[in-house]
């Protein structure tokens, strides 16, 4: 399956053959894409939320008032969950939110996400992702030629330092090496830009 290669000026400079089993899957499995995104987002959660239980709240252990004769409901501690300033019952604790997902499913998710973008016409192959200087304004002018609101840029094994520095201050533009290609960023950005090297490495990786 052939597609055109574009320059950073959004001009056609050649053709490249893409593996249809990676970039043009016939039936897009949105359920697999969602599974992988849920796995990614859960793994990214810090899990450092914490509330104090009765045993952790600072305060006296003295009984608030005598058991009988006051007309109040009996109380054993000022730190109980029903008391103002007391502990919290069944509150969040520090934990990992990460879940398990088979590598095969993760791989399928990436394939289906790439195929979905290609089917939408929003996966573009760029001949080179290298800049002469790390100028943000220069890169903004380049990206404006693609008329997109957000860009996920995937380079080969290494990212060009000038491109990376220029993209740092551009809203909704992310550049990663091929190892950083992930379903969440592919789906949440409008356009996916792949270098020729990224195409070759991804085809080898996802074969």
Swiss-Prot record:
The keyword Ribonucleoprotein applies. Residues 50-76 are annotated as: Disordered. It comes from the Bacteria. It holds the Pfam family Ribosomal_L4. GO terms for cellular component: ribonucleoprotein complex; ribosome. GO terms for molecular function: rRNA binding; structural constituent of ribosome. One of its GO terms (biological process) is translation. Keywords: Ribonucleoprotein, Ribosomal protein, RNA-binding, rRNA-binding. Belongs to the universal ribosomal protein uL4 family. This is Large ribosomal subunit protein uL4. It comes from Rickettsia canadensis (strain McKiel).
